[in-house]
UniProtKB/Swiss-Prot annotation:
Full protein name: Small ribosomal subunit protein uS8
Lineage, broadest ranks: Bacteria, Pseudomonadati, Pseudomonadota, Gammaproteobacteria, Pasteurellales
Pfam families noted in UniProt: Ribosomal_S8 (PF00410)
Intrachain S-S bonds: none
PROSITE patterns assigned to the protein according to its UniProt record, in alphabetical order: RIBOSOMAL_S8
Example GO BP: translation
InterPro entries, sorted: Ribosomal_uS8, Ribosomal_uS8_CS, Ribosomal_uS8_sf
UniProt keyword terms in alphabetical order: Ribonucleoprotein, Ribosomal protein, RNA-binding, rRNA-binding
Length: 130
């Protein structure tokens, strides 16, 4: 059976990996997953990521911990294949009053809610991370 929502699967792997205190997790790679991993790395929620080439490219994410506690407290899918959620620049949400981030897919690429607001862009809200 094919996977219905690969992004939700990615977020679940991150959540489960940190719950099990894994050093790194791997998953099938895609352009959107790499873009999301890049935003998470920029914002300091994951240590790093790399693409392992092969017959099927794999995305390997190195998870980040602070004092043996996961840096990612919660990671939640917002827009999903059955119900896409789009917001204009002035409607972009602040996650935990600005302490968390919303990952937004815009016409200029995947970025945080802060970067999208600064660029004056709206888009699809992929997930919330806190």
């Amino acid at each position: 059976m094919s996977m219905q929502d690969p992004i939700a699967d990615m977020l679940t792997r991150i959540r489960n990996g940190q719950a099990a205190n894994k050093v790194a997790i791997s998953m099938p790679s895609s352009k959107l997953k790499v873009a999301i991993a890049s935003v998470l790395a920029e914002e300091g929620y994951v240590e790093s990521f790399k693409i392992v080439e092969g017959s099927k490219p794999e995305l390997e994410i190195t998870l980040k911990y602070f004092q043996n506690k996961p840096v990612v407290e919660s990671i939640q899918r917002v827009s999903r294949p059955g119900l896409r959620i789009y917001k204009r620049k002035d409607e972009l949400p602040k996650v935990m009053g600005g302490l968390g981030i919303a990952v937004v897919s815009t016409s200029k690429g995947v970025m945080t809610d802060r970067a999208a607001r600064q660029a004056g862009l709206g888009g699809e809200i992929i997930c919330y991370v806190a």
